[in-house]
Amino acid sequence: MPELFAYTDGACSGNPGPGGWGALLIARDGDTVVKERALKGGEAETTNNRMELLAAIHALEALERPARLTVVTDSAYVKGGVTGWIHGWKRNGWKTSTKKPVKNEDLWRRLDAAQARHEVQWEWVKGHAGHPENERADALAREGMAPFKPGKSKAGR
């Protein structure tokens, strides 16, 4: 049975500013890539953390059936949030340990729902360190951001 991986990344030009997200879904049988799907998108005004979250969300939501997969991210924010902090946030009514509202609550809720139907293992990799699939996810995120960068006409979107 093929192993499924989702490599995700977000990018932002300014923080906040125009941003993009990218996700690369790969099914592997050993070292052989059986199937691959690239996803990308962007927004005119966003933050890097929102784009990182959306990359993971879109990767999980793109899967038509429940699956066992590894999501690989270079975002300590996403990995730390989804594997640890989120449990406390939910217990505390979406408040942090200091009783402040959780930033990006809308996306954390969506990510929580998206991962609930799958068996997900989360893995962190160092960004911009030559990891081929992470570099490809980064390129997709930058492509997703491109139509929203200053100087691009709205007709080109």
Curated annotation (Swiss-Prot):
Keywords: Cytoplasm, Endonuclease, Hydrolase, Magnesium, Metal-binding, Nuclease. It is an enzyme of class 3 (hydrolase). Gene3D superfamilies: Ribonuclease H-like superfamily/Ribonuclease H (3.30.420.10). It is found in: Cytoplasm. Mg(2+) 2 binds at residues 9, 138. Binds 1 Mg(2+) ion per subunit. May bind a second metal ion at a regulatory site, or after substrate binding. The keyword Membrane does not apply. It catalyses: Endonucleolytic cleavage to 5'-phosphomonoester. Mg(2+) 1 binds at residues 9, 52, 74. Residues 1-146 form the RNase H type-1 domain. Monomer. Belongs to the RNase H family. HAMAP family: RNase_H. This is Ribonuclease H.
